[in-house]
Amino acid sequence: MDKVCAVFGGSRGIGRAVARLMAQRGYRLAIVARNLEGARAAAGDLGGDHLALSCDVAKEHDVQNTFEEIEKNLGRVNFLVNAAGINRDNLLVRTNTEDMLSQLHTNLLGSMLTCRAALKTMIKQQRGSIVNVGSVVGLKGNSGQSVYSASKGGLVGFSRALAKEVAKKKIRVNVVAPGFIHTDMTKDLNEELLKKNIPLGRFGDALDVAQAAVFLLESPYVTGHVLVVDGGLQLTM
């Protein structure tokens, strides 16, 4: 049976690194991003017969159409990675409601919608694996990231509850929780200052997180787990 993996947020950063590893392992990939050109570029870099799609994960209709296109072109999805995410860092008293909702909708609701759509086919197959990309601040919290922390903390609770719901269907759900990783989201941070708080003394790379995500995707006896990939940052928070 074909191994079909949908990677939301697959056009850059962690999602793109996951897609690269999965392609090397023989998976057929659907690279999904808001920006279709970015998705096409990422899919093209992989070589082979991979699919590029545009989707706003916070819109139910978009998500449903995306899964229909994947099934029509690649087959039923049996692996799902939710790496789409945004941040709008600010103190809560300075955060407007629009920025609150955009983070909650993309980071939490979006993963709920993609998981629900994927489960419809995974349950029929009686197998499947889902990895949601969280964050260490969803576990520890961080000043100036209260809303982002809430969205990622909510993702952990959601993933653990979902893991319980679908375990009897042979479907696994896990979370990878990165710390400071070299991506577009961290490019403006003061790395020299921040890495002093990281026991391993450096920011991670997208590949560091991707390797952990692939481990969770393929480990048949791991579910409901949160794998922190942060160079030891949580030890100091």
Curated annotation (Swiss-Prot):
GO biological process: daunorubicin metabolic process; doxorubicin metabolic process; fatty acid biosynthetic process; protein heterotetramerization; protein homotetramerization
Alphabetized Pfam families for the sequence: adh_short_C2 (PF13561)
Residues at which substrate binds: 135
N6-acetyllysine, modified sites: 195
Location within or outside the cell: Mitochondrion matrix
Keywords carried by this UniProt record: Acetylation, Fatty acid biosynthesis, Fatty acid metabolism, Lipid biosynthesis, Lipid metabolism, Mitochondrion, NAD, NADP, Oxidoreductase
GO cellular component: mitochondrial matrix; oxidoreductase complex
Molecular function terms, GO-annotated: 3-oxoacyl-[acyl-carrier-protein] reductase (NADPH) activity; NADPH binding; NADPH dehydrogenase (quinone) activity; oxidoreductase activity, acting on the CH-OH group of donors, NAD or NADP as acceptor; quinone binding
Annotated catalytic residues: 148 (proton acceptor)
Catalyzed reactions: a (3R)-hydroxyacyl-[ACP] + NADP(+) = a 3-oxoacyl-[ACP] + NADPH + H(+); a quinone + NADPH + H(+) = a quinol + NADP(+)
Keyword Isomerase: no
Gene3D superfamilies linked: NAD(P)-binding Rossmann-like Domain
InterPro entries: NAD(P)-bd_dom_sf, Sc_DH/Rdtase_CS, SDR_fam
Tree of life domain: Eukaryota
Record's keyword annotation contains Mitochondrion: yes
UniProt family annotation: Belongs to the short-chain dehydrogenases/reductases (SDR) family.
Functional summary from the UniProt entry: Component of the heterotetramer complex KAR (3-ketoacyl-[acyl carrier protein] reductase or 3-ketoacyl-[ACP] reductase) that forms part of the mitochondrial fatty acid synthase (mtFAS). Beta-subunit of the KAR heterotetramer complex, responsible for the 3-ketoacyl-ACP reductase activity of the mtFAS, reduces 3-oxoacyl-[ACP] to (3R)-hydroxyacyl-[ACP] in a NADPH-dependent manner with no chain length preference, thereby participating in mitochondrial fatty acid biosynthesis.
Name of the protein in its database record: 3-oxoacyl-[acyl-carrier-protein] reductase
Name of encoding gene: CBR4
